Design a protein with these regions (language model features):
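Phosphate/nucleotide-binding beta-alpha loop and adjacent structural elements of enzyme active sites
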Residues: 1-287
């Protein structure tokens, strides 16, 4: 079945998909640097609108369905949504990190739901990053970065290049021969020191094992961490173990949404506690 027919078929039963209550969609074929499917997306309430470019024969359409139809990053139905929304409103410049941004669909979803946030998306694969940049063009608050993410500033190479478009993995090393800069979360926070940490979304295909191996003080600064773990993809590799150790002593709720785990701080909304958390995080003390 042609990709445009597949997408159109999705919209024939809008009640099946929560995203159809949030957005209107208009799929069409388009040509720009090669043939792809374009989907015009408009919010049913508010002024958000964008055109998504998806590659036929890839996992782009499945990613689109997860984010915009099944709304796996939606918090509005969670018991703590009002608390999350209040915290967001209290931030002058909320910061969202989209680590493993793929082609930018998650960044755009965050831009719709949290319109005053600065969204920094990091994606290692060149093809994904090119489409990411095209998809977010015109959205001034979305900052695309090509690179990997790691526990410290280093370099990386992409491995398993034959994987699907959402399955690229990175291997961290200290040699520039890798050709790809790997940034730490602290570097991103330093670059945007005028912003207040809000959401950190992580989908980095098993690289969470290295990311959480050290220098995890930043975790306490984010009221919301959204992560997809990959033990199912790499059995007996312990890819989630370091994440679990990093958050084990923290007071947080954990909520499953699709393939993602939402980790929501119990201290959110308490200014004195947030200030204390920041101080303890800087000192390397778990909260």
């Amino acid at each position: 079945m042609l990709p445009i027919r597949m997408i159109a078929k999705m919209f024939l039963r809008p009640r099946k998909y929560p995203g159809c209550q949030e957005f209107s969609f208009a799929p069409r074929l388009s040509r720009l640097d090669g043939r792809f499917v374009a989907v015009d997306v408009r919010a049913r309430h508010g002024s958000f609108g964008t055109t998504l470019r998806l590659r036929p024969g890839t996992t782009d359409i499945e990613t689109f369905a997860q984010i915009f139809l099944h709304t796996h990053y939606r918090t509005h139905d969670m018991a703590r949504h009002s608390e999350i929304a209040a915290y967001y409103q209290s931030c002058a410049k909320p910061l969202v990190l989209d680590l493993g941004a793929n082609i930018g669909l998650s960044s755009l979803y965050f831009a719709k739901n949290w319109p005053k946030a600065t969204i920094v998306g990091v994606e290692p694969d060149e093809g994904n990053y090119t489409l990411f940049s095209q998809n977010v063009a015109g959205h001034e608050r979305i900052v695309p970065i090509r690179g990997a993410i790691a526990s410290k500033h280093s370099y990386a190479r992409i491995i398993n290049p034959g994987a699907s478009e959402w399955g690229y993995r990175t291997e961290i090393n200290d040699s520039k021969s890798g050709g790809l800069v790997a940034l730490s979360v602290q570097e991103l926070l330093d670059r945007h020191s005028d912003c207040e940490p809000f959401i950190c979304k992580i989908d980095i295909e098993g690289a969470e094992r290295e990311l959480f191996s050290r220098n995890t003080q930043w975790v306490a600064r984010f009221p919301i961490v959204i992560i997809e773990l990959h033990d199912w993809l790499f059995p007996r590799s312990g890819t989630s173990a370091n994440f679990l150790r990093a958050i084990a002593g923290m007071d947080r709720d954990f909520i499953l949404s699709g393939e993602n785990i939402f980790s929501i701080s119990d201290r959110m909304g308490n200014p004195e506690q947030v200030e204390t958390n920041d101080a303890r995080a800087q000192a390397g003390i778990g909260v």
